[in-house]
Design a protein with these regions (language model features):
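Conserved PLP-binding active-site segment of the aspartate aminotransferase-like
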Residues: 358-364, 380-413
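N-terminal "arm"/small-domain region of PLP-dependent enzymes with the aminotransferase-like
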Residues: 10-81, 92, 375-378
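Conserved core of the PLP fold type I
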Residues: 14-16, 65-66, 72-218, 229-251, ...
Length: 424
């Protein structure tokens, strides 16, 4: 990895040290001349991680018994909600009964989109309007957050309301005030464990406050995307309180709709996605799915179920991923620490899991940092992408994804310098 001298035109730098400025320009130009091609824009598993799941491809062959424990033939139609073997280990992740789990295709994002689309056209709760009939409908978007979440609700013409993130998760004072006083607010996006991009895990208090919400809208829903539920990268992993368990205590089991997938466990694009919700929610969701699909890829479900066995099998497999990812995160964090700590030009997260390191540079410089990195051959997530409508009000947040570049790339981090742009 090389992220070099990326903001080198600051008036401050010129005032303080013309010599240092010239040295940074020279260093940056030197890096540009190396012809780097490093992609750190999205949380894609690297080839070394993909190879960990190669044995999955050998689980099913022409002589394999494709009948489930309950007698379903995975080669045929049927089993709208998925096979029991798969539902069982997803139920452990979600902390729900297997009957409240629906196993889908390869994409949890697809299931989230379908869920919003379904609620747009049919009432979530009897007596409520379909969301498309709600004028000035709104959705809460903790930010910085996941750009593809925001894009779904933007596509359906929701007003996206940013909610500040804290070290404990979304600012619950803001969430409670908005949700409990505005019935046009229909939901909130959440990545509760190792959030994208901050790597924060919601505190116990935050989870409990979510479970205790008293929304003005009866059809308000928490879109709980637990994408990184087993994705630790250190030996001190975070623990996430069970939202559904807390909702049972408060009588709010209809609030959350939960999602996850094996996309960053086995093969992205060829994994298995799942969702879970209360009986009431699942009745609405399944009623819509029955018009949409007969069944998803049960052979892939069977392949995954037999490969892992249960949640313990998943956790053992994730230890292999941790062994690959941990040094990659350390490379990024050590570079930031050694090159930027003393400059006062940036702050960054040090997550225990997930796929990202979030860097906050000086206000008004993130776009320029990303642009200059790209010119130097390092592709980062577009500045602003982690905020609704792609607009970071401070132009300061940059998401770094360490997973995709191999460890044998040149590792000579120099200065990721965040200075103000422009020169008089």
């Amino acid at each position: 990895y090389e992220i070099s001298a990326c903001l080198v035109g600051s008036e401050m730098c010129i005032r303080d040290s013309e010599k240092e400025y010239a040295a940074l320009v020279a260093e940056y130009e030197e890096v540009k001349g190396k012809g780097l091609k490093l992609n750190m824009a999205r949380g894609k598993p690297g080839e070394d991680q993909l190879n960990l799941s190669r044995p999955l491809l050998d689980v099913i062959n022409s002589s394999t018994d494709c009948i489930t424990a309950h007698g379903a033939d995975c080669r045929n139609y049927g089993e709208l909600a998925g096979i029991d073997e798969c539902k069982n280990f997803f139920a452990e992740i979600f902390d729900v009964d297997p009957s409240d789990v629906m196993v889908g295709g390869n994409s949890s994002l697809n299931m989230m989109f379908d869920t919003i689309a379904g609620f747009m056209t049919k009432p979530v709760v009897e007596g409520c309007k379909p969301w498309y009939e709600v004028k000035n409908r709104k959705f809460l978007c903790p930010a910085p957050g996941y750009d593809r979440h925001f894009a779904i609700t933007e596509y359906f013409d929701f007003d996206l309301i940013p909610v500040p993130m804290t070290e404990n998760g979304p600012d619950m004072d803001v969430v409670e005030k908005l949700v409990e006083n505005d019935d046009s607010i229909k939901g909130i996006w959440c990545v509760p464990k190792y959030s994208n991009p901050l790597g924060i895990t919601f505190s116990d208090e935050t989870v409990k406050r979510f479970a205790a919400l008293k929304p003005a809208a009866k059809d308000f829903r928490i879109m709980w995307d637990n994408a990184y539920c087993v994705h630790d990268v250190t030996d001190t992993p975070d623990e996430l309180l069970s939202l559904m368990a807390e909702c049972r205590k408060t009588g709010n089991v209809d609030l959350p709709i939960m999602f996850t997938s094996t996309s960053k466990i086995t093969f992205p694009g060829s994994g298995v996605a799942a969702m879970a919700a209360s009986d009431n929610n699942m009745k609405v969701i399944k009623n819509r799915y029955q018009y949409q699909v007969i069944s998803y890829d049960k052979m892939n479900m069977l392949r995954h179920a037999r490969f892992f066995g249960d949640l313990n099998g998943v956790k053992e497999h994730m230890k292999l991923h941790k062994a690959v990812l941990k040094p990659k995160f350390e490379i990024v964090l050590n570079a930031l620490e050694s090159q930027l700590k003393e400059t006062g030009t940036a702050d960054w997260t040090n997550p225990n899991g997930g796929y990202f390191v979030s860097v906050d540079v000086l206000e008004g410089t993130a776009k320029e940092v990303v642009r200059l990195c790209k010119e130097a051959g390092v592709v980062l997530t577009g500045a602003g992408a982690t905020y609704p409508y792609g607009k970071d009000p401070k132009d300061s947040n940059i998401r770094i994804a360490p997973s995709f570049p191999p460890n044998d790339e040149p590792v000579s981090y120099t200065h990721l310098r965040a200075h103000e742009t422009g020169r008089n």
